[in-house]
Amino acid sequence: MKLKSFLLRYYPPGIMLEYEKHGELKTKSIDLLDLGPSTDVSALVEEIQKAEPLITASRTEQVKLLIQRLQEKLGQHSNHTFYLFKVLKAHILPLTNVALNKSGSCFITGSYDRTCKLWDTASGEELNTLEGHRNVVYAIAFNNPYGDKTATGSFDKTCKLWSVETGKCYHTFRGHTAEIVCLSFNPQSTLVATGSMDTTAKLWNIQNGEEVCTLRGHSAEIISLSFNTSGDRIITGSFDHTVVVWDADTGGKVNILIGHCAEISSALFNWDCSLILTGSMDKTCMLWDATNGKCVATLTGHDDEILDSCFDYTGKLIATASADGTARIFSAATRKCIAKLEGHEGEISKISFNPQGNRLLTGSSDKTARIWDAQTGQCLQVLEGHTDEIFSCTFNYKGNIVITGSKDNTCRIWR
């Protein structure tokens, strides 16, 4: 085995090794999820070298420099104050969703007007209009980290795959018998998964546009789906109160997560694929062992439905957003609530961490988005200006740009 090169992954911190084995180029990753600004770099490199024979003594200084770069990134933009950069009158009818590509250079909006629009983040200029759906475009996603394709799911029961650069439609995926309300690319960007009100999810081949398999088993609408980091598992959350874990290669059921007593609102894996987090209208979130499907904790405290939930990039923190107007931060290790985020005057429908994991972004029906300190729960900033409910808000990969989407038909870029 011969080491060819290093690649850095900033969030969550990690080093990818490209190496040659029997004439074939392979990659492996060293996850540094515990890396912090005060980590002893020399001791860490020593530890890595004990476990990884590819990193020989001659590479020691190089690896130290790489880890120092990762440390610097963790501290960047941590005290960033956001200012309104642009208001985009994005569509003539209400927006449904907003998604950013990985670099944050462009983003996409979906709308009730049956179109999607691609926007340049730096200028706020429209790049392309994606036309062809015959009903509301509800679900949208980029094939991050590549970002050269986008998928759109519609109430017209189809999903379309588009070129980001040209706006050309590559494929129209047909087969669902009801509205498509969620979708996701696998990390390898070879498959698109779609979830529908017809109670099924489907996997589609990006290259040839063919259906790979149908995931059947839910008895009610599927409203949430996501792949794990390695792309070999997919989870679907349904109005039937259950979450199902599927084998992404065969389409077979791996586990059924039964425990919630109302509709599921969100379901996702943590970074290392060991845990699954589910949020429900029953006012709780549950943590599950991703291998055996057993519930390991129930996160309680909210007085109303959980509308969104998420892990930070490392999987150490969990955030929950509720119709009770508050958000909460939990430790994934102790399962204890470490902060309660109070200040919104309406339900919170969206929540996400910045890539560095020290800030939280919430969007609410009170027409504002807020930035919070993820350790203390203190509100650091209120993003005001929308004239109707905010249903979508997201950080870019660097954590220095925020996009908000509202029922007032506008999108705002904050930087």
From Swiss-Prot:
Supply one GO BP term. Answer: intraciliary transport
Which InterPro entries does the record associate with it? Answer: G-protein_beta_WD-40_rep, WD40/YVTN_repeat-like_dom_sf, WD40_repeat_CS, WD40_repeat_dom_sf, WD40_rpt
Gene for this chain: DAW1
Q: State the WD repeat positions.
A: 90-129, 132-174, 175-214, 217-256, 259-298, 301-340, 343-384, 386-415
Q: State the superkingdom.
A: Eukaryota
Q: What is this protein called?
A: Dynein assembly factor with WD repeat domains 1
Keyword NAD in record = no
List where in the cell it is found. Answer: Cytoplasm, Cytoskeleton, Flagellum basal body; Cytoplasm, Cytoskeleton, Flagellum axoneme
Give the function comment from the record.
Required for axonemal dynein assembly and ciliary motility in ciliated organs, including Kupffer's vesicle, during embryogenesis. Facilitates the onset of robust cilia motility during development.
Q: Entry's Pfam families?
A: WD40 (PF00400)
Q: Which SUPFAM superfamilies match?
A: TolB, C-terminal domain (SSF50960), WD40 repeat-like (SSF50978)
**Subunit composition and interactions:** Interacts with IFT46.
**Gene3D superfamilies in the record, alphabetically?**
YVTN repeat-like/Quinoprotein amine dehydrogenase (2.130.10.10)
User: One GO CC term of this entry?
Assistant: cilium
Q: Which protein family is it in?
A: Belongs to the WD repeat WDR69 family.
Keywords (alphabetical) are:
Cell projection, Cilium, Cytoplasm, Cytoskeleton, Flagellum, Repeat, WD repeat
